[in-house]
Structures are given as structure tokens and as C-alpha cells.
Amino acid sequence: MHNQAPIQRRKSTRIYVGNVPIGDGAPIAVQSMTNTRTTDVEATVNQIKALERVGADIVRVSVPTMDAAEAFKLIKQQVSVPLVADIHFDYRIALKVAEYGVDCLRINPGNIGNEERIRMVVDCARDKNIPIRIGVNAGSLEKDLQEKYGEPTPQALLESAMRHVDHLDRLNFDQFKVSVKASDVFLAVESYRLLAKQIDQPLHLGITEAGGARSGAVKSAIGLGLLLSEGIGDTLRVSLAADPVEEIKVGFDILKSLRIRARGINFIACPTCSRQEFDVIGTVNALEQRLEDIITPMDVSIIGCVVNGPGEALVSTLGVTGGNKKSGLYEDGVRKDRLDNDDMIAQLESRIRAKASQLDEARRIDVLQVEK
């Protein structure tokens, strides 16, 4: 319900990872990566399905060996979300997973062998309509670039990326996206800015090895937020030393905060003070867990008193303003009811679910009318 101008996205070409469009104005895709042993098919499939349930558009799977490639075949048969195979050093693994229906190959052309082996992988990708992600990382820069620049710099990451881009250009292959990741926020941001000026391919964003759940989320929000606010980025991954499910949640939270892509409820809640009339923190924590299944975009404000509550409620889908024993409930900016403070969680959950159903039905009718 806010009316700020939308962020102007950088123009880029369009590729597809499975059925997911990437670039050229397509919704920014949110992805994660499994951290199970790929050869443990059951565990990997379960984790991929858990990621899909919280909204993952794409999932990357490490395929370091031929045994892992054979496991990948079984995994691919049991999931519906597009899969990216992460491959280094052995070109034969790339050829094998291509046979098994991989949706995207994450490689660096420079580390999978000589020109003939690179050509074999690219020709296979072209024949099977499989895109490639070039993944440059500050932690694995080529030795000559480390010697040339002394340390990872934006110019070093750009030069590395352009080497790999040139490999694919020489082979007339244009179905690829590029990433230039670093664990340092400023290094990553400046590297992406430079790259965005050099090529028009889709860019995959990430602050690599960002840290644990809290610190990693903060670094990613700052780094990715800066780039996204400048219109840079077509897919993203939040890299956390945590459950991969949290990566998807944080990724969508970043996009929601910038009003780029909405999924689920955007909770607005006060940090509380002695003026709060009900347990705001407990209410928000409970509702975030209970309502994770709702994917309908909604703004829900939960404010403990009348200082800021009415103002936030005016621009929320649903809003609660704390009052003595009963709190005001607003819907689309209009006060509609009063809720008992002692039963706030259950009452709000019921109202939010009802509103989500109402919005879903309205969208369904709109779609039917457009189709007519």
C-alpha cells in the first residue's frame, strides 16, 4: 500500500533454468544449495522438498564425483524444482548430469580442462538447451590474478569473470549467467557493479561464506540490498552456515523489504516499551511460525500502543493497535473491530487467514476475467 516508484531493473538477456525465467525483467529468483551428501539420495531429496515448500525457485546440488552424478539422476527423478549441478575440475561429470536432465550447470570453464573439453561441455549444453552459470569466487581466484593484484580486488574478480565469458563467447554460447561472489560486502558489491557495466547477461547475486544465521543474514541484506536497490541482479542466494531453509526465508525477506517481490506476510512490529498493551513480541514470534504456510503477499502491522499504531495500520493490509484490555483491528486502513488482548494470537491468526483467502479469491476472479 506504499506508493514509492519501483526500482528500475538493469536490462539483461533472458535464459531459462528449467521452467524458471531468468533476466529480462523476470521475477528475481531465490535459490539455495543442499548441504547433504549428494550420495545420500533420501536426505538430499528431503532437503530439496523442504526448500521448495518455503518457496525456493531453484536448488543447487554439489556433484563432486561420478557416484554423486549417479545419485543426482535419482534425485532429479524425485523432485520438481529446477536443479543446478555444481561441478568443478572433471568435465565428464558435467556431461553425465546433462544426460540425467540437469537444468543448469554451474562451472568455471577455466577449471574443467583444455579447450576441447570446454567445447564438449558447451556443445552438450547447447544441444540439450542447458544454461551455464559462471561462478567466480574471491576465495578461488586464478593464481596469476592473485599474483597480478596481490589480493582479491573488484578488478581481479571482473578480469576472472570476463575470461570465462570470453571462453563461452568464442564458442558462440550465450545461455549463461554470471556471479562474482566475495565474503567481503564491499568487494562483492563493487565487483558486481563493474560486471554489470561490462555484460548484459543475467547476474546471480550472493555474498559468499557470509557467516552464521544472524551475521550472514545481515551481510547479505546489506550487500544484496545495495545491488538490488540499484537494479542489479536477476537471481540470488543468501549463503548461511545454517539450515538452507533459512537462506530462502532471508532471501524473500530482502526482496520484500525492497518491494521487489512479495511472498507471504510482511510483519511490521514495534520493538515494544512500557506503553505496550499486549505481548507484541510473543504475538509476532508465534504468528510468524503459525503462518509460514501463507504465500499471499500481505502487510500486517502489530503495534503495542496508540502512538504509532494507527499510522502503521493505515498502510497495512491488517493492523493491530494496542489498547486497554482490547486492541483496535484495522483492515485496509479502516478500523473494523476490537480484539481481546488476552487472546490476541488466536484471533489475529484467524483474521489473517480469512483475509489471505479473500485476497486469493479476488486474484483468482481477476485472472479468470483477464482470460475471458
Swiss-Prot record:
Q: Lyase: is it a keyword of this entry? A: no
Any idea which UniProt keywords this protein has? 4Fe-4S, Iron, Iron-sulfur, Isoprene biosynthesis, Metal-binding, Oxidoreductase
In its UniProt record, which GO terms are filed under biological process? isopentenyl diphosphate biosynthetic process, methylerythritol 4-phosphate pathway; terpenoid biosynthetic process
Q: Give the catalytic activity.
A: (2E)-4-hydroxy-3-methylbut-2-enyl diphosphate + oxidized [flavodoxin] + H2O + 2 H(+) = 2-C-methyl-D-erythritol 2,4-cyclic diphosphate + reduced [flavodoxin]
Q: EC annotation?
A: 1.17.7.3
- How, per the record, is the cofactor bound? Binds 1 [4Fe-4S] cluster.
Q: Which InterPro entries match?
A: Dihydropteroate_synth-like_sf, IspG_bac, IspG_bac-typ, NO2/SO3_Rdtase_4Fe4S_sf
Family in the record: Belongs to the IspG family.
| NCBIfam families xref list | ispG_gcpE, PRK00366.1
List the protein's name: 4-hydroxy-3-methylbut-2-en-1-yl diphosphate synthase (flavodoxin)
At the highest ranks, the source species' classification is: Bacteria, Pseudomonadati, Pseudomonadota, Gammaproteobacteria, Enterobacterales
From the UniProt record, report the name of the gene that encodes this protein. Answer: ispG
